[in-house]
Amino acid sequence: MAPRKGKVQKEEVQVQLGPQVLDGEKVFAVCHIYASYNDTFVHVTDLSGRETIVRITGGQKVKADRDESSPYAAMLAAQDVAEKCKSLGINCLHIKIRATGGNKTKTPGPGGQSALRALARAGMKIGRIEDVTPVPSDSTRRKGGRRGRRL
C-alpha cells in the first residue's frame, strides 16, 4: 500500500456580510416599526426599502398571544434587531413608525414607543423619526354604525 497523504489544510476565508466601512463611519438603514394593538413588527431594510435586513415581531419573543403587542415584547424584538444590525455593520437607523391607519386607529400601539427606546438604548444612532401611518383622504365607512360605538 502507498503511504497516506496528509490532510490538505484549506484556508478559511472570513465572509463579512454588510457594507465594507471604516471605523467611525455611519452606515444607515431604515427601521420600519409597525405598532398595532395586536402585535409589533420591527423591520429593518436598506435605504431604498427593497432589501430586508432583519424582521422580528413581538409575537416571536413571547409565548402568550395577549403579550404580542406589549412593550416588553417590542423591547425584546428591538434588542434582537439592534444586535443583528451591529453584526452586519449597521450603526445608524432612520425610524419610520406606523399605526394601523386607514379607517382604523391612527395612534400607534403600546409597543411602538418602547421599541424605539430599546433601539436607542442598544447603542444604535437614530437619524430621522417619521410617522408614516396611512391617513385616508376619503375612506370607506368606518366600523360602528350610524350611532357609533356605545360604551
From Swiss-Prot:
Where is composition skewed (Basic residues) in this entry? Answer: 142-151
Single GO cellular component term = ribosome
Q: Which domain of life is it from?
A: Eukaryota
Q: For this chain's UniProt record, which GO biological process terms are given?
A: translation
Cite the SUPFAM superfamilies for this sequence: Translational machinery components
Q: Does the keyword Ribosomal protein apply?
A: yes
A molecular function GO annotation:
structural constituent of ribosome
In Swiss-Prot or TrEMBL terms, this protein is called Small ribosomal subunit protein uS11
Native source species: Procambarus clarkii
